[in-house]
């Protein structure tokens, strides 16, 4: 279907066409190879921004550390990280003055959370640096390994399952003279394959015990592993992101809980809300500024951009903020919250995989691991890499670089937002004490600043004052990348505001299409995405109808399930034609079985099986939804599933869709090749967890299934539950006396085994 693209714009106001300029169609760029260079860039840049600070040496690890706090006041417009403690504290005090009781209340909420949070909170999240294996692992596995090592080193506070007790273990582990860990290693040997008679490499996985002295353990506990950020659109250069280990994560979680609680109470904060709620919150601030700038005042808005937000922030500043926010709170609470910034002040950045070299004859490839960068001859490297390595060398310890200043990406989003809002808060007339005043919006490093004044000079003065105030707390507004406009037109976190928010539809483009989970889920997710965009993103009825047709077309090509009466030949067409011919009510066939599409924009909320149920032949119904059919997925039927959809920017978000279990909701089997790698042990652990959890849920069906709170273990809980259920069943005559006796005997045996263990 050919469309002349210029026709689209005939009647569209310019601001609505903004979304067509976004780089969101097609595949996003991914990084290949090693992230070592990007990480070195980050470390070197961060030190450059703070270069006039004081150097000290960490007594425990021997790492050189740069402290820029209370450094020289800037004399030019270059970005710098010299935050002034007293300025930050004063900004906090004024924030509290404008919002009486805000810190007090947030502390109380957080204290409650600290008492109640379970350690399994840390299993959420993707890749995590696993310090026991010195590489990334899924969060659940990294946590399990950490707890296992703690246990074998005599740390057991964590048995109760509260996060705070796990953190006590972390603190104790740092005082130990040595920690014993189990590491995995691979042995490779060449053997002859019996079948093919060729030589093959056989890998076996070994486990060995290793002792870490206090210094090595501390370095690992303070290490952030680095990777390259993938799928970033609109940028030519890749950049490094960090993933912290389990020792840091729990402490960060509580700090962010406190900061989140504060952000929720601040009208200028774009976090932690999202979507329509965020738009409403922002529109309020704009409305306030426009209403108050009567005919006598001018109002201008800056679409702001900060230079290297993370690299100029400083954990020592966050420590000062937390010290102030929690000043009237109990000692233990203040201690728990100050550990995260302390650990970040002493953090180490792992340089990643290192460099790959190839000889000119292309016969040889060799990997230079990051650990060797400290000693290798630099003649092998090109100029730019050589400069990087020379610069970073004084900071290297065991393949990690000491990185005291700066925060890595995405660690303290909420807390840094509080800092940003505290500067926006200073724009009230009672603080500026002149004719200009400002307000704005802050969401992590993104901001919009609205300045009101009687004339242009006043606006300029207001912007200058804001700019300089930011400099005092280590925030560097970029004069090159920020632009100013009459209030009413600006952009904030990719929301475009023009007398109200304009839908930036292009951002949703990547989530249209076929997800590739299975036929059932893909159909459901596809129509749900279209439905959601009609609700939230100004997707009009005509466009939605077209999107639906394109989706169905895409779906049929993906699963080769063209209509039974089509001429298109695919691998499946023979079977589908046969089905089509022997089906009486053809409208009842699912699209994935070669049926027609009955969706239109009015019925997108109904799962396809329900939509067509009345139209189906009886024997088709029986095959499709028969629990004895081996192809029907045997998961309990959840009425709602979660899919991960990729919006164009920001993290993948979870989206709910209706799920009906049929023969089409198959779950693909896992790739076998993992079984031959060092990941195999991890896989076995995961399966064991899975089995335990499934067993537990059998004993505590979802109606009564709350996470076990209290001190009994899962086994004890299941045994006592089994006894209670057995007694009830016996007394009501559902089971015989012999069965009851057998259950009791099994329970006693389990308890006995647990005691012996």
Curated annotation (Swiss-Prot):
Q: Subcellular location, in the record's words?
A: Host nucleus; Host cytoplasm
Q: Under the GO molecular function aspect, what terms does this record hold?
A: nucleotide binding; RNA binding; RNA-directed RNA polymerase activity
Q: Where is this motif: Nuclear localization signal?
A: 187-195, 203-216
**InterPro entries noted in UniProt:** RNA-dir_pol_NSvirus, RNA_pol_PB1_influenza
**Which Gene Ontology cellular-component terms appear in the entry?**
host cell cytoplasm; host cell nucleus
Q: Which residues lie within the region annotated Promoter-binding site?
A: 249-256
Biological processes per GO annotation: DNA-templated transcription; symbiont-mediated suppression of host gene expression; symbiont-mediated suppression of host mRNA transcription via inhibition of RNA polymerase II activity; viral RNA genome replication; viral transcription
Q: Tell me the Pfam families matching this sequence.
A: Flu_PB1
Could you state what the record's PTM comment says about this protein? Phosphorylated by host PRKCA.
Q: Give the EC class as a word.
A: transferase
Q: Name the catalysed reactions.
A: RNA(n) + a ribonucleoside 5'-triphosphate = RNA(n+1) + diphosphate
Residues in RdRp catalytic domain copies? 286-483
Q: Which family does it belong to?
A: Belongs to the influenza viruses polymerase PB1 family.
Q: How does it assemble?
A: Influenza RNA polymerase is composed of three subunits: PB1, PB2 and PA. Interacts (via N-terminus) with PA (via C-terminus). Interacts (via C-terminus) with PB2 (via N-terminus); this interaction is essential for transcription initiation.
- Role noted for this protein: RNA-dependent RNA polymerase which is responsible for replication and transcription of virus RNA segments. The transcription of viral mRNAs occurs by a unique mechanism called cap-snatching. 5' methylated caps of cellular mRNAs are cleaved after 10-13 nucleotides by PA. In turn, these short capped RNAs are used as primers by PB1 for transcription of viral mRNAs. During virus replication, PB1 initiates RNA synthesis and copy vRNA into complementary RNA (cRNA) which in turn serves as a template for the production of more vRNAs.
For this entry, the protein name equals RNA-directed RNA polymerase catalytic subunit
Protein source organism = Influenza A virus (strain A/Turkey/Ontario/6118/1968 H8N4)
Q: Which gene encodes it?
A: PB1
């Amino acid at each position: 279907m050919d469309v002349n693209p210029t026709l689209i714009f005939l009647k569209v106001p310019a601001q609505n066409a903004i979304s067509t300029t976004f780089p969101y169609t097609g595949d996003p760029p991914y990084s290949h190879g090693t992230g070592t260079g990007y990480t070195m860039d980050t470390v070197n840049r961060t030190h450059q921004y703070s270069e006039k600070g004081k150097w000290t040496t960490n007594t425990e690890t021997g790492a050189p550390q740069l402290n820029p706090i209370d450094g020289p006041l800037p004399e030019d417009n270059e970005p710098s990280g010299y935050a002034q403690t007293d300025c930050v504290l004063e900004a906090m005090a004024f924030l509290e003055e404008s919002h009486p009781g805000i810190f007090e209340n947030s502390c109380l909420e957080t204290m409650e959370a600290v008492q109640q949070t379970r350690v399994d909170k840390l299993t959420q999240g993707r890749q995590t640096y696993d310090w026991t294996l010195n590489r990334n692992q899924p969060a659940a596995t990294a946590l399990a390994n950490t707890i296992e090592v703690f246990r074998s080193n005599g740390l057991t506070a964590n048995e109760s399952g509260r996060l705070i007790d796990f953190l006590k273990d972390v603190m104790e582990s740092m005082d130990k003279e040595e920690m014993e860990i189990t590491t995995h290693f691979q042995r490779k040997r060449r053997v002859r394959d019996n079948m093919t008679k060729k030589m093959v490499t056989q890998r076996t996985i070994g486990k060995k015990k290793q002792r870490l002295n206090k210094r090595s353990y501390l370095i690992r506990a303070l290490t952030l592993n680095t990777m390259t950020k993938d799928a970033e659109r609109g940028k030519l250069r890749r950049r490094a992101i960090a993933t912290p280990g389990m020792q840091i994560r729990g402490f960060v979680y509580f700090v962010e809980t406190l900061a989140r609680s504060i952000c929720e109470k601040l009208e200028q904060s774009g976090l932690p809300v999202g979507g329509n709620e965020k738009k409403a919150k922002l529109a309020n601030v704009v409305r306030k500024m426009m209403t108050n700038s009567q005919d006598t005042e001018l109002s201008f808005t800056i679409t702001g951009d900060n230079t290297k937000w993370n690299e100029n922030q400083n954990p020592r500043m966050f420590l000062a903020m937390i010290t102030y926010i929690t000043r009237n709170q109990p000692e233990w609470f203040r201690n728990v919250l100050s550990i995260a910034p302390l650990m970040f002040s002493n953090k180490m950045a792992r340089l990643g995989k290192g460099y790959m070299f190839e000889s000119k004859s292309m016969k040889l490839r060799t990997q230079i691991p990051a650990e060797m960068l400290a000693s290798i001859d630099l003649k092998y490297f090109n100029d730019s890499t050589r400069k990087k390595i020379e610069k970073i060398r004084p900071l290297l310890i065991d393949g990690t670089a000491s990185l005291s200043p700066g925060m890595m990406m995405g660690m303290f989003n909420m807390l840094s937002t509080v800092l940003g809002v505290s500067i926006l808060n200073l724009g009230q007339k009672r603080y500026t004490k002149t004719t200009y005043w400002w307000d704005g919006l802050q969401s992590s490093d993104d901001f919009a600043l609205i300045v009101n004044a009687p004339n242009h000079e006043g606006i300029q003065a207001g912007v200058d004052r804001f700019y300089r105030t930011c400099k005092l707390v280590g925030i560097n507004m970029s004069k090159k990348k920020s632009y100013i406009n009459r209030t009413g037109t600006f952009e904030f976190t990719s929301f475009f505001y023009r007398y109200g928010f304009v839908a930036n539809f292009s951002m949703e483009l990547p989530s249209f299409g076929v997800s590739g989970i299975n036929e059932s889920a893909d159909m459901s997710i596809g129509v749900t995405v279209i439905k959601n965009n009609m609700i939230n993103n100004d997707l009009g009825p005509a466009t939605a109808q077209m999107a639906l047709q394109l989706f169905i077309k895409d779906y049929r090509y993906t699963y080769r399930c063209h209509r039974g009466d089509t001429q298109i030949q695919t691998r499946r067409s023979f079977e589908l034609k046969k089905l089509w011919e022997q089906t009486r009510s053809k409208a009842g066939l699912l699209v994935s079985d070669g049926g027609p599409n009955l969706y239109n924009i009015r019925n997108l909320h109904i799962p396809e099986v329900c939509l067509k149920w009345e139209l189906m032949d009886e024997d088709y119904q029986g095959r499709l939804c028969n629990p004895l059919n081996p192809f029907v997925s045997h998961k309990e039927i959840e009425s709602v599933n979660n899919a991960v959809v990729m919006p164009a920017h920001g993290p993948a978000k979870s989206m709910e869709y209706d799920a009906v279990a049929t023969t089409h909701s198959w779950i693909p089997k896992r790739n076998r090749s993992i079984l031959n790698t060092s990941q195999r042990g991890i896989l076995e652990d995961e399966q064991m967890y899975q089995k335990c959890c499934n067993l537990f849920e059998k004993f505590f069906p979802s109606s009564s299934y709350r996470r076990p709170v209290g001190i009994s273990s899962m086994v004890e809980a299941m045994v006592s539950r089994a006894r209670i259920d057995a007694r009830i069943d016996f007394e009501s005559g559902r089971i015989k006396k012999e069965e009851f006796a057998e259950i009791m005997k099994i329970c006693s045996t389990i308890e006995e085994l647990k005691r012996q263990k």
